[in-house]
Amino acid sequence: MDKLEAVTGVGQDSILEVRVKLVDSEPEIWRRFELRGSLALSQVHQVLQAAFGWEDAHLHRFVTSDPFAPLRPVDGEIPEVPQWLPQQGCEEPGDKPEEDCSLDQLLALGHGEAFYEYDFGDSWLHRLELVSRRSVEEGTSPARLIDGARRGPLEDSGGLPGYEEIMDALDDPGHPDHAEHATWVADMTGSDEPFDPAFLDIADVNRTLAQLL
């Protein structure tokens, strides 16, 4: 048993039902997965990238609590908050390699929840919530998307405020920025087809996940 396993009590593999939402999105952008608890966080990163339509073009991290919530002093000092990053990005004392921590271990440390931040500029913050667990059955996929709503925002759209502004302009042909934003969206998506923020192809996501893991 390794040190992290001893702390979390996590050992035997399970299938975890995990709900992931993009924090503060309205209407809510969310996904519900069945994931093996033994998946390394580096693999969970790949799953979230595929499911939300990200392009893995920016930095990311996992943490056990909201990274933007005020911290309470402990014995008069602000506690160090650990974060899990790709091994090559670990530079600070609280940085831990995401390759060495499993999803089950992270959720145990966070008492059933965790956060994944992608793109520290736009700051796309995802909240992971453990819904249930069951034993692993033969032939169970390591990662499967079972439900969700709405496509993920476009890369480099300026966080949720910027993305919502772009969507508002697209939805209003009379908006002064409609043409500019329509051109930008077409460039980003590589398509002149109308952009539908409500679209989500679960089957396509699962095909991608099957190739990744």
Task: Please tell me what each predicted stretch does.
Residues 1-213:
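Short linear regulatory motifs enriched in tryptophan with gly/pro/ser
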